[in-house]
Regions:
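Acidic, Mg2+-coordinating catalytic module of metal-dependent nucleases/exonucleases
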Residues: 129-136, 140-146, 177-219
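Bacterial N-terminal signal peptides that target proteins for export
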Residues: 1-10
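Catalytic phosphate/metal-binding cores of nucleic-acid and nucleotide-processing enzymes, i.e., regions
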Residues: 140, 150-154, 169
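Conserved non-catalytic scaffold segment of RNase H-like nuclease domains
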Residues: 29-39, 46-135, 184, 191, ...
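Cleavable N-terminal signal peptides
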Residues: 11-12, 22
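Short alpha-helix plus adjacent loop in nuclease-associated cores
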Residues: 160-175
Length: 219
């Protein structure tokens, strides 16, 4: 009898402990799509290693689940260590210190402030799904930047992330390359002109791919 009573108490305590978590997770997007927002994110960096390299810009376009744009933000960022630029990265994004200074680059702390302010303005009380083409790359750099300035990535975005090539893969489009995928979908590829290839052009491309994939789904 004592064992049964203790077990009942334990179950009751666990139920109370996990009730807030269960409430926080519901409702899911299929049940309440109007309670969710997608953050289409793309970043440009000085290299591939977030422990050494830094973001030089970020583009964010927030949409509803149907792909309708809610707002966008572009921030050009002056890295603390521009001398660490990888030449492969420079060929992709055209990073140049003088050009960045002349075109409104801000420091990392100010960039984080703008991103967080925009995020809260766009989301309201809704949950936000981090969405990107190269999701692991964009996630690792945004997480690193936020952490350096006292902001938790987990406080901003839902724990599931969406990567666009996986969405395409599920529809039989197995080209992981953006140029090939844009060809398969019949949409315009992102510019490959280095100085014009920015976080916001990447985010806009991601949104166009997402919308094209939605249009292919059976209704």
């Amino acid at each position: 009898m004592l064992f049964a009573t203790m077990r009942q108490i334990l179950f009751a305590v666990l139920a109370l402990a996990f009730a807030p978590l269960a409430h926080a997770q519901a409702p899911w997007p299929d049940a309440a799509p109007d309670q969710w927002v997608m953050a289409h994110v793309d970043v440009e960096t000085t290299g591939l290693d977030p422990a050494r390299h830094e973001m030089i810009d970020i583009g964010l376009i927030y949409t509803d689940l149907a792909g309708a744009e809610l707002g966008r933000l572009y921030v050009r960022i002056m890295p603390d260590h521009p001398e660490r630029i990888d030449e492969g990265a420079r060929r992709v994004n055209g990073f140049d210190v003088d050009y960045w200074r002349a075109h409104g680059a801000v420091g990392e702390a100010e960039a984080v402030r703008q991103i967080v302010e925009f995020h809260h303005r766009m989301r309201g009380e809704k949950r936000v799904i981090f969405t990107a083409f190269n999701a692991g790359f964009d996630l690792s750099f945004t997480r690193a930047l936020f952490a350096q300035h006292g902001v938790s990535w987990n406080d901003l975005y839902f724990y599931h992330i969406l990567d666009i090539p996986s969405m395409a893969w599920g529809q039989g489009l197995t080209a992981l390359n953006a140029t090939e995928l844009s060809r398969d979908l019949g949409i315009t590829d992102e510019t490959r002109v280095a100085i014009e290839h920015t976080g916001i052009t990447g985010a806009a491309f991601n949104v166009s791919v997402y919308r094209a994939l939605l249009a292919r789904r059976p209704h």
